Amino acid sequence: MRYGNDKTENEIIESVIGFEPLYESMMKCKKGVLWKNQPAHYYLNGIEETIKLSDQLRNGTYKPRKTRKVKITYPKPREAVANAFRDRVYQRSLNDNVLYPAMTRSFIDDNMACQKGRGPDVAMDRLDEFLRQMFREHGLNFWILQGDVHGYYPNMSHDKTERRFHRKVTKPIYEMTTNVLRGQYEGSTGYNPGS
């Protein structure tokens, strides 16, 4: 087992496609979008829609709906992929219940990017600790390198990403993940997280 816990493969799959995890994902996905027709319809029929989605995932008849490409201009111009609400519910369940824990387990403590309980405030506190330590050890005789990886997600290799998932998750979860990614992103490079 690649997760470092005692769950069986069926329990792991159920933690993604079972009614409760999908319903919980719907509750998270609905925030701020219930004014739109598709999310409102799904939410108003939440129990029925979630049972239907769970059954489709269980019996292999689930097919993601066509994605739409959307241009975003703020805070910086970029292209995003808009998924159908039910597809977002499934993807959120897959991410929150299996992928996120499996992938972040190996991150260094100082990685603050897109992690629960981390963010700008924690990063600033950690930077403050480092600066104080460097000042104690070196006075004013030290340098800081500030950098940003420009175009990281748009240039990310699909093959490399899939290999990383393959190393971290079981085969059924890997297949679920690659089906989502391949269905949503064309070509051999580029992702748009948060879409």
Spans of features found by a protein language model:
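Active-site-proximal segment of RNA-dependent polymerases
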Residues: 2-13, 95-154
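Active-site-flanking structural segment that lines cofactor/substrate pockets
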Residues: 47-77
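Non-catalytic, polymerase-adjacent accessory regions of viral genome-replication enzymes
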Residues: 1-51
